[in-house]
Every structure is written in C-alpha cells, then in structure tokens.
C-alpha cells in the first residue's frame, strides 16, 4: 500500500486514538482514583473503604458491593488539589484528542475519495492529507501530555497525604487506566510522525505540511477568461492583409 493511498499506519493510528479517548472517558467517570481505608479493631464491625473519584464518592464495607454512602455532589466540594486539576485536565485532553481524530478522518477521507483529475474551481478548497495527519500527531502529543502529567501527580500526592495524615491513602486502578490511555495517545502521535517522516521523502509537494497544489495542477492552463484582459499585442492574433 503506497503512501498516496490510505496507509495501514494512518488507520492504525486512528483506531489507537479512538481506544485512547475511550480509555480517558472511562478513567474520567470511574470512582476509583483514591482509596481511604479505615480499619477497625472491633471484631463486631467491618472495615470501611472510601472510594474517591473525580465526580462521586462511595463508601462501602469490606465484602459488600453496595455503597453505604454515595455522594453525587462530590465534584463541587473536592478538597484534594490533584483531583480538582484532573477535573479540568482530562476533559480538555479528550477535547484535544477528538479534534485530532477529526483531522485524521478528514485526511483519510480526502486520500480515499480525491479525484485524480483536480477541479480548478475548487483549487483553493483542496485538503492536504499529509498536513492533516501531521497536525493530528501534534494534537495527540499535546493531549497525552495534558492527561499524563496530573495522573502521575496523583501518585506523588498520595505520598504527601500519607505523610500529612496517616498511611491510609492509596491510589486505585483509574490511575492506571488514564496513564495507559495517555500512553496510547503518545503511541498514536509516534505512528503518525513516523508515517509522515517516511513518506515525505517522495519528490512531491503533496507531503508538505501546508497547502500546495498537486503536481497535476501545474499541467492545466488557465481558462481563456483569465487571459482575456491581455492586450492585442500580447495575444497572438493573426493579421490578414489584402494585396491589390
């Protein structure tokens, strides 16, 4: 499959981007970012674990699947700085990644359905597929950075909480889901960069990141209406003379 066709690398990056955005969405909604485990020494009582998410909080006894306390207004009263930052960082990261997916889709559709004979009237509306993929790679990298940094901060903030209070705090599996999704965004960006750097060595302006006419556009002459403003001297008009 040539670089001028819909390449397997671009399809793989698109699917990887979708999976990464889905992982970020799941990590954003999961109520399993931090656990607060309260241990009792009374044999007649059970240990209590408080699961803290970005939007809700749930407290349940050990061995129970039902929440003893389910706080749906937790998102407005979050008192932990790392979770408050994640409330803004993860939706922003998903928004950037979805913009990158849209650019990837535009680039692939333009590559798959473009005509081999360009329409001169639509010359200013042509889409540069390589440029779309290049910008999408940059956006994927930005989205991964926005989501990865605060997710790793949760790990170090747990250490701070355990030192400040008691060693009862631990991070939960939503941290792993988000870090893995951010890694998927970085891998998507890397695939697009490798694809672009491999294909741009072709001697064609098609691989320039900015808009440029395809090579076949230069073989077309301008319509006569664009030349009609030339003077009679510039236009080669045959002159017929009559001899007596």
Swiss-Prot record:
Main function: Plays a major role in tight junction-specific obliteration of the intercellular space, through calcium-independent cell-adhesion activity.
Topological relation to the membrane, as annotated: Multi-pass membrane protein
Ranges in the topological domain labelled Cytoplasmic: 1-10, 109-135, 196-244
PANTHER family: CLAUDIN-12 (PTHR16703:SF3)
Protein name in the entry: Claudin-12
Modified residue annotations for Phosphoserine: 228, 231
Quaternary structure and partners: Interacts with OCLN.
A GO MF term: identical protein binding
Organism: Homo sapiens (Human)
Family under the similarity heading: Belongs to the claudin family.
Transmembrane helix recorded as keyword: yes
GO biological-process terms attached to the record: calcium-independent cell-cell adhesion via plasma membrane cell-adhesion molecules; maintenance of blood-brain barrier
